[in-house]
Design a protein with these regions (language model features):
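A cross-family "folded-core" feature that marks the main globular domain of proteins
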Residues: 1-125
């Protein structure tokens, strides 16, 4: 039932068709599974940070599957995030590898940076 509700939420918020909705929902669940396995934690799905992560994943997946990735602009900030949050960046790398392998899509440095920030927040919550 939770999966069915999630499908309707994604559909309502992103205004996508059923196949796109299923693709996005499946993608989000697989990313969450990667995160849980990487950190070996149970995520607090009631937390504000988890809610923000889910919102990020919804729009991230929509950009990804419509080939509208963000442009790399602030390389210094990207480097700082990568260096200061190396463990979380490692999780983002796992997600990047999954996306490349399953969908043959690449992530920009900016997408990696934002993903890393969200991963840091949910992994310490």
């Amino acid at each position: 039932e939770a999966g069915f509700i999630a499908l309707h939420i994604v559909n309502a918020e992103l205004d996508t068709n059923m196949s796109g909705m299923i693709k996005i929902t499946t993608f989000m669940q697989e990313v969450i599974d990667i995160v849980k396995n990487y950190y070996n934690i149970v995520l607090n799905e009631d937390s504000l940070d988890f809610g923000r992560f889910i919102t990020h994943l919804k729009y991230f997946s929509q950009r990804l599957f419509s080939n509208k990735s963000t442009k790399d602009t602030d390389f210094q900030l990207q480097r700082m995030i990568r260096e200061n949050y190396s463990k979380d960046y490692g999780c983002a790398e796992k997600i990047k590898e999954y996306i490349k392998e399953k969908y043959n899509l690449n992530l920009t440095g900016e997408e990696m940076m934002f993903l890393t920030i969200h991963l840091k927040r949910i992994s310490t919550n």
